[in-house]
Amino acid sequence: MRWFLVLLLVALVSVEASRRSRLFKKLYQKASNYDAAPSNVQTVWYKNMKLDHFTWGDTRTFDMRVMWNNTFYKPGGPIFFYTGNEGGLESFVTATGMMFDLAPMFNASIIFAEHRFYGQTQPFGNQSYASLANVGYLTSEQALADYAELLTELKRDNNQFKMTFPAATQVISFGGSYGGMLSAWFRQKYPHIVKGAWAGSAPLIYMNGGGVDPGAFDHITSRTYIDNGCNRFILANAWNATLNLSSTDAGRQWLNNNTVFKLDPRTKIRNQTDGWNLNAYLREAIEYMAMVDYPYPTGFLEPLPAWPVTVACGYMNANGTSFSDKDLVKAVANAANIYYNYNRDPNFTYCIDFSICGDQGTGGLGGDELGWPWQECSEIIMAMCASGGSNDVFWNECGKDIYQTLQQGCVSIFKSMGWTPKNWNIDAVKTLYGYDLSGSSNLILTQGHLDPWSGGGYKVDQNNAARGIYVLEIPGSAHHLDLRQPNTCDPNTVTNARFQIIQILKCWVDPNCNTIPTISPLPSISIPNGDCKDVVGGYPWGQTTGATVSNSFILAILASLYAMF
């Protein structure tokens, strides 16, 4: 769910522009060879996918990329279907190891479908983002219809793939971040096609009317750092320190020639506006490390050590409040270097003007970098901002009307296409999918306690649980860690959550399972020590159903005793 992630496409020429650009937090993650989960996928193409599923007057089509692995599939087994999100499929294949780990147990086929307008699935080729008329077909609703058509085709005799799944084949959808949102909505919109959904770190209610505080993301980011030993004063005051230094000749001289970081020659500090640019650059690293605070080395966004927030706090944990401006900036910059330059490349430079260099924090996204901003400027409109003070360690950027500020950002990005506020629907998600789960069933919604995006997810509700809607907030877990390949360094909470989820999946695909599974509270967190290694085919990872039942039994006894007194 990226996150999160910030895609800063507008030059930060003022404080207000900085606020606008930071509103586009992109959930996409870029994988690397650090995240090489076992996959062995084959690429195939769905030919002649409908461009517009909701009219009979438009017969245009495009080709959609699909990756699959049928090594473990046996007739009668389910389809594990990944609802592709805002990026190329490769990232999601390598970062969703649980699907591959479970497939042999379930005799499952693994299918990843690429989201229209992302990766290699470009309906209009290199003109996909050339006009509003073209990019207007980039919607979650159209993408879900793509997935529904693909699965329908796969169950059709003599289909274009020359591989037919029985009509009774159960489909379980998987997804993380925006992909998790799609996975949950897929089950809600197409329950006749999808038996159930595992949606990891999906901010399903972070839109208008969902009841989420706009400051939730940065509140949780700040909590993750403070809980890991960071001195709140250092983080909260470093931003003004940057501005103070950028306001004087001596301060600018130091910022441009210090020994902690090198600035790109094109983006030297010349004024306080450049100081804001530096703040945005440093903050991006702080936020992203909270998202990907994994217990082992990864390369999900950039190459990072295990528990990167803990490592970062090693530079920001000095006691007290008596720090010079230079001390504060050095502390946060050293922390940011863990994200941007963990491999200590001596030639690495901070390019802090995103209009010149793009976003170094999520570089390599390809030619579809306008995709997520378009979706945030049309249907998936998330009001997010830091407010400082007691809420978080950043500056107050909320302003009087967060949506008006967001609109100004949309105009800046899409003005050449003629974007106006008429092109967005602030209530699109509420109208298309809704926030009330009373009519839904068979949803597994996981949230990582460390993950800033968890603030946009559902909370535990016993009424929902009675309908087979499971909400798990997992201590010690960052952005959809539960969907990644199991690892010896995973906290026991993550392992137990996976184990319980698998019992639910078993019921969903078993035609003889007529009882809604229940889940138990997760155990107190314990973090393993030692070498971190992927665990392939390790289910049940030392967990037992009996232990889970026993925990529930103990809780029931305690509740009864409490009632007696």
From Swiss-Prot:
Family per similarity comment: Belongs to the peptidase S28 family.
Signal peptide: 1-17
Taxonomy of the source species: Eukaryota, Metazoa, Ecdysozoa, Nematoda, Chromadorea
Gene3D superfamilies reported for this sequence: alpha/beta hydrolase, Serine carboxypeptidase S28, SKS domain
Catalytic machinery residues: 177, 451, 479
Sugar attachment sites: 69, 107, 126, 240, 244, 257, 271, 319, 347
Protein name according to UniProt: Putative serine protease pcp-1
PANTHER family attached to this UniProt entry: PROTEASE S28 PRO-X CARBOXYPEPTIDASE-RELATED (PTHR11010), SERINE PROTEASE PCP-1-RELATED (PTHR11010:SF104)
This enzyme's EC code(s): 3.4.-.-
Keywords from the UniProt entry: Glycoprotein, Hydrolase, Protease, Serine protease, Signal
Superkingdom of the organism of origin: Eukaryota
Annotated GO MF terms: dipeptidyl-peptidase activity; serine-type exopeptidase activity
